[in-house]
Regions:
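Flexible loop linkers connecting adjacent transmembrane helices
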Residues: 2-3, 7-11, 26-66, 245-264, ...
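Extracellular loop-to-transmembrane helix junctions
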Residues: 4-44, 226-234, 333-346
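Membrane-interface alpha-helices at helix entry/exit sites of multi-pass transporters
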Residues: 8-16, 56, 60-73, 110, ...
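Transmembrane helix-loop junctions in multi-pass membrane proteins
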Residues: 9, 83-95, 117-130, 148-160, ...
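Helix-loop-helix module between adjacent transmembrane segments
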Residues: 18-46, 55-92, 96-120, 274-285, ...
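Selective recognition of specific alpha-helical transmembrane segments in multi-pass small-molecule
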Residues: 21-29, 109-124, 135-155, 188-191, ...
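Extracellular/periplasmic helix-exit of transmembrane alpha-helices
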Residues: 29-35, 41, 147-163, 177, ...
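Membrane-interface loop-to-helix entry segments
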Residues: 71, 75, 79, 92-98, ...
Length: 367
């Protein structure tokens, strides 16, 4: 949604390119996260991610133990900034969708969203069990509905692909100085959707129970690719299959819900609002999961810092519900850009280890 809002149809193509190229970086960073994971004394299980494998790499190069490594610290701070920004995006999307569907004032919906999120975060056992049951059902419903819409409009699909490729390389965008915006927004939103190279996903990959580090890498490479090329593409097609005169000038949830209203009537608007509301909590929990290992790296193993970040994330959730659509992306864009820079710096020299693990894994498979 954000890619098309800011960069038009051509941004979808660059999201695909990001997904294809990003699969290799996703494999390397997830494998490294498994190689350098460590026990988590607070939550149990394992933790890890770029802050940890960067730290290990510097210690190996300098051949001495370090309490903190500058690049690891910078990555962890950038990650926390990014995830605070994503918290704003979550609430902004939900609040906008409910305003469109039910005319609920943003302040009321923001308060409800933050209150429910606080219950889930601070006392989550029962609510998480409910989400575990409901969210997969909604995901299947969204998948089926979007596929049905695409099938119903199969005749228009070639025109959509033509528009995507034309605007990705079009002379019109280049002449208007818009090609850079198309490319930039496609890559930025591609990074948010597949996370490849940014260092977010390895925080989760480190916690996985794997007998071979490579397995986490392969799963991550496939997951990021499918997430962008299949899941995000379906949403893009829904918007691009709507008549241009109906969606011109719209952005964010206004764009998506107007497109859904064209395809499914009022039901489409309400369906998007309900789906986003449920998905927002699982996404928010995912963000906090990513954040906790970086908070631990920065401030040590203590509950005070963990709770403080959760409270900060709830505050950002509140701010995002009331802020302008373009504003809420800014903090996330800055954070993910810095994360990617610090992560890629280390992925290049460390990539050999991941590739070595892959070769050994392939040898075992051939036996």
């Amino acid at each position: 949604v954000a890619a098309i809002s800011a960069g038009g149809a051509g941004a979808v193509f660059w999201m695909w390119v990001t997904a294809i190229i990003g699969s290799s970086t996703a494999f390397i960073e997830a494998t490294l996260a498994q190689l350098y994971k460590e026990k988590d004394p607070l939550y149990g299980g394992y933790r890890g991610g770029p802050a940890y494998y960067i730290h290990a790499y510097v210690e190996e190069k300098q051949k001495k133990k370090r309490n903190k490594v500058v690049i690891s610290v910078l990555f962890a701070i950038s990650g926390l900034l990014c995830w605070c920004g994503i918290s704003q995006v979550i609430s902004n999307s939900v609040v906008s969708s409910f305003k469109n569907a039910f005319s609920i004032p943003p302040i009321y919906m923001t308060v409800v969203l933050v209150a429910v999120a606080a219950v889930i975060v601070l006392r989550k056992d029962a609510t998480v069990k409910i989400l575990d049951m409901v969210v997969p059902v909604m995901a299947v419903c969204y998948f089926v509905i979007t596929i049905l819409i695409i099938v119903m409009n199969l005749g228009s699909l070639p025109g959509v692909f033509a528009r995507i490729f034309e605007e990705a390389f079009g002379f019109r965008q280049a002449a208007a100085g818009g090609f850079g915006a198309v490319l930039m927004n496609g890559i930025k939103r591609g990074l948010f959707s597949n996370e490849a190279g940014s260092g977010s996903a390895p925080c989760a990959a480190a916690a996985a129970e794997c007998d071979q580090p490579v397995k986490a890498g392969l799963v991550q490479a496939l997951g990021g690719f499918v997430g962008t090329t299949v899941v995000c593409s379906r949403t893009a097609f829904i918007m691009l299959l709507a008549p241009e005169e109906k969606v011109t000038g719209l952005s964010g949830m206004d764009l998506l819900q107007t497109a859904m209203e064209h395809h499914l009537g009022r039901f489409g608007v309400i369906f998007i609002a309900a789906t986003l509301f449920l998905f927002s909590f699982s996404t928010f929990l995912g963000i906090l999961f990513y954040a906790r290992c970086n908070v631990a790296y920065l401030f040590g193993d203590n509950w005070a810092s963990q709770i403080a970040y959760k409270v900060l994330a709830l505050v950002m959730l509140f701010i995002g519900g009331l802020a302008a659509y373009t504003f809420v992306w800014d903090l996330g864009d800055v954070g993910i850009g810095l994360m990617t820079i610090f992560n890629i710096i280390i992925l290049y020299p460390q990539g050999e280890k991941a590739l070595k693990e892959l070769k050994e894994y392939e040898k075992e498979k051939r036996k």
